[in-house]
Amino acid sequence: MSPWTPQVFTPCPDHPDVLLGRVAARSAAFEGTSAAGGARVIVGSAAGHEREQVARSARGELLERVGNVMAGRAAEAAAETVATHGELRRRGLAALAPPGLPDSRRLWVRGRTVAGAETYVAAGAVFLQHRPPPGCDTLPSTGSTGIAAHPDAASAARHAAWEVLERDLVRRSWYGLTDRAPRMLDAGPAGPLGALIEDRGLTASAFALPAPPGAECVVVALHRPDGTGQTFGARCGPPGDVAALVEKAAYEALMVRWSMHTVTARGAWEEWRGETPPTTAVQHALWAYYRQDSLSLWDVARTQARDRADPVDRTGQPDRADPVDRTDRTAPAGRAGPPRSNRPADPLAVLAGHTGQDVILVETSTKSVRSAGVRVVRVIAPGALPLPSGHVPGPGRSRPHPFG
């Protein structure tokens, strides 16, 4: 078994066709993460009902993150271009203006627009767990949204573009920044996952977010019939096969649900108890699961969900050990309709049209990752923002978002 071989297992033995895959790498080059209880570990995970696909997806997620971090360490050691944004512009170099503190000294790396123009990008916007070289200001680094690994760079870029668009559409909808409400879908996952959801007495609430032409973005929440215990997943892709997007989003929500019963999540909840706004991915997921009726806040709660005047569940009591819950009654999920269209969509073009700005690509493939047969690409789309952490003051919905 190679270091990149995931463990594929069944979270519910009575539903052996529903699979989770996980694989981890440890290194002093990594920073501690909340998902690993502070350990210097990077994890790749996936869910599905085809063993080879689950293993491939979990391995790909690990490789994209490891490749990105290690490419960052190489760039940090070389420290080839350290400057302020203004200094780069005075040298006649195209550079993406960083948000906030434009006069800060940073490490910069080369990227290219989709059209091929060279553009410098701040390393903190490219690399996970960025460690600024000496002489640079210490600033927050970016998250994993917008990194993908595939056998070829073009496929990796397309995958990452869908991911960037997905998170921006979720952000805009959750914080009330769109002029349209989410559209409820009479659709739920079928097949092995649908059977598991029905057997566990859970409800799958699926809805579509406002999306630009050429894209469809769906969110799925798994929860008990009374609306408690919510976990979320989302997926963005080309229009025409909503059923596939719903299934992928539902599997993501299932992974989050399973993770709520891990030692790391239980320990985090016992220590934190939701007494302050969430600041990490794990805390956001715990907040949605134990404390917040996010479906009601999003104005998309199904009639099966309990109508509560107070949108916060203050009990905060962990469930039984069943990794995806079991209740006394069932709530069959709906079934997705037929595909609407098979028209191909270029996610890079859709993303550029959505933001009105050039999309920038930075390859972060290391030698070890290339030897594993993949290329890693970071997609940066000015104007498309990731989900923030914690409370966001201002107009619209200010409660913490429910995505871990």
Placement of each model-derived feature along the sequence:
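Helix-biased "structured C-terminal domain" signature
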Residues: 1-316, 328-404
